[in-house]
Structures are given as structure tokens and as C-alpha cells.
Amino acid sequence: MQVWRVNLRERSLEREAAPEAWSRLGGRGLSARILLDEVPATCEPLGPHNKMVLAPGLLVGHMLSSCDRLSFGAKSPMTRGIKEANAGGSTGLHMTNLGMQALIIEGQMPRDGRGASGWWLLHLSLDGARFEPADDIAGLGVNETASRLLKRYGDKVAIALIGPAGEMLLSAAGIQNLDKDRVPSRIAARGGLGAVMGSKRLKAIIFDDAGGQKPPIANREAFRQAQKLFNKNTLDHPQTKAYQEYGTPAMVRTCNAFGGLPTRNFSSGQFEGAETISGEHMRDLLLRRGGESETTHACMLGCVIQCSNTYGGEDGKAIVSPLEYETIGLLGSNLGIADLDTVARMNQEVSDLGLDTIDMGAALGVAAEAGLMQFGDGERALQLLAEIRKGTPLGRILGHGAAMAGRVLGVLRVPVVKGQAMSAYEPRAIKGTGTTYVTSPQGADHTAGNTIRAKVDHLDAKANIATSRAAQINMAGFDSLGACIFAGFGFMVNPEVIPD
């Protein structure tokens, strides 16, 4: 496996042998190592000295369920510290087929004599790197951009791309990836890494793995035995069965019962309309509607959990894919909205802009606190999201996330840690996750170490310190393997399958 290093200023590609010290690093572990070694801690996140690292997990490409995730890393314009966000989809798989252990993108595209650099596509294949103008798709939403690129390059490629939010360098912008059905629905959402990509004037990265090979396995027989055990443990786990039925929205009832469902700008942890936005209600609704609706859907090839979904409207036509728990919590209950159709429309708009639904839900909650909308008013929320697409001053304030919205609008209740919005787990009710928010270098991020499933008194702060620490260590390991958080169901039953 190699490290591919792209220098944007020189428009060059170097393929380097990965150091031996990196042989057991992948995903978050590898991106963190590279950033710590190569990026000045005091650099401007949107300046030329910041680097963007794409690192597939160690298990990516080996046909393990839920283990094809890709980590994106950079210094964050939101937290101002080291940041990793990961996503499912097909990009990591294509990278490993091309022999990439990591892709490092450094510098910025040079400007012409008028100070303009335009927008660019980076095309990567076994033949090397190619830079192509992208001004014809600048300003387009994620869905239209992906559609045009697939027509141009064919449906066999993988694509990592940004939407208008990334082009505007908004701090809540993420990086979208294609799922197994070629839909740009898998976003590395958190921390503003889409803005970092935008600062480098890259609209999209195209990965063409034609002629590539699957990554090598040192001991194929041992791997197969561990694979069988992992697959069995994953399939047999009761949580897998719950997610196969209801997906991540199954957490709505659970968190509401805990008092951990963010409600009206985190002023409460229980929502009177929780039942109408629950996973159980959504499943019944989608089954009745049929058409393009899917109650379960895999974002990666071969995933047995299939916790994703496609949310169809009354006519059965898809509105958005996926509609996840975090989005329901932040764009639903956190805004006092109890209608899934409205939440789905908001989700679609946020995703097409290339924004993080968590930070957008929190930013709109702050806007409601400031009097710019009433809690429960979904149409007004959609109007505020339209301000972002227009690029108005108000839209840019909201697009920078909840922390910026709070500072500009003078709101004191702002649910952020290290500048990043809290996920849909109220920290006063789930204190282990709250401890993770506070102690993780990544800020408020449930994927850094969520403790909701721990067998502990969630209201006992001291008892949850060790719980949070263990969860953070486990998640760092899963992120380095390229494993979805739910793949942990299989690993934690028999942890020995990992070293095997």
C-alpha cells in the first residue's frame, strides 16, 4: 500500500511507500498521525499550510460487514483543532483498490493574474492524477453535481464532493460520498472539513479504480476464520436486529425515555411529539407509502445491519436518503417539529447544500431562541435554510454553525463544545456522552465515544468517567479499522477477532 501525495500548487502527484511505522495505522489513527507530523498546530485551517488527509480504515476492502468507512482529517475551521470525520459509501473501497493507504492533499490551487483560481476536479486512477476545470458545476447542489459527474466519468467511479456550503467556506460544511447505489448520501459531516476542501478550490475528487486490486491479506485462512466469527456475532446481536427493523431512528423512543432527546434548543430532554418522529412510526409510514421508500438500506456493499433508509413522501417518491436519528433529533425535536415529512424536506435541503444536519439543527435552535423563528414552525426553518443557499449574510451566519449563530445573535444557550454542536444525546441525562463531549479533542461528537448503551447509572457523573474513557478508546480503534460504530456489536462480543 502507498501514500499518494497531491500538491495542488504544483499540480503534482507523488506515490510513496508507506513507512513501516504506519503498517498498523488506518482511518482516524493514520490521519491523526499525519496531521500531527505535518501540519503546524497554529496554521489557519483555511490557509495553504493545512492539509486534508483521506485514510481508509485497515479493514476496508476486505468484505467485512460495515467495515468500509473512510476517514477525512484536517485542522478544523470549527473547533480550531485536529479533526476527523468519517463516512460510509464507496470512496474508501476505491482507494484501497488503487493501493492507497492514505491520500494527502496539500497546498492550494494557484491563482491567476487576476487573483482567481476557479474550481477544479481532481481525477485519480492508476494512471496518476489529472486536474480538470469544474467551473461548469460550481454552485450546484450535491445531487446535481454528482449526477453530472457520473454522466461524465461513468457509474463505476467513486466521488468525494462538496456542495455550495463548502464553496462558501462555511464552517458546518461536510464532504459527501456516493453510497452503493451511486447516491451522494454519505457525508463526513462534522467539523467543517468541506470548507477545508473548498479552501483548496476542489469541487470534487474522482476515484477510478479500473485495473485495481483488492488489498492484500497476510494470512488468508486466519482472516476467514475471524471473518466468520465476526459476521456471526454481528448478525446474532440483538441491537443488529433492532436496527434492521427501524434503523437509527429506533433511538428516538430510547432517548426520550432517558430524558436525553434534545428538545427546543436543548432546553428539555423529552418531547411530547416523540412518538410521531420515532423509528417505529417511520417504519409503519414508509411501509404504507411504498414506492421508492425503503425502511432499511445499506450504505456500504455487504452490510448486514442496513441501518439506513430512503424516506418517501405521500406519493412514494424519495425525498431524502437517509433520514437518521441525529437528524430527527436536531431538525425535529430540537426545533419542536413533530412532522417527519417536514424533517425530511429540511434534511434534503441541508444535505444538498453539503452541510452537517447536526450543526444546522443546533443553529436553527439558536435562531429560534433569538426570535428568528418559532419552535415548531417548519416552513420558517426551510426559509432560513434557503438563506444559506442564497449566500445572504444571515445564511452565512447560520451556515457557520451554532457557535457562530450564538455569538452573532447574542444567544446565551448555545449547545456546543469546542465550537461544535452537540449531537442528539442530551448530556445532562446521558452524562457519559457528556463527558466525551467535554474531553474529546474533537468537541461535541457522539461518534467519539457514545455511552448510551452502557450498563451504568447515566445520571451519575463520576461513574461515567471510566465509561466515557473506555468508549473513546474503543471508538478510536473502530475508526482506525474503518468499522461503523455498529460493527462494534460484532467486535465487542469477541474482541480477539481484531488481533486475529
Which positions does each model-derived feature cover?
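Protein-protein interaction/assembly regions in multi-subunit complexes
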Residues: 1-194, 199-214, 220-239, 252-274
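Extended C-terminal regions of large enzymes
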Residues: 13, 150, 157-159, 164-500
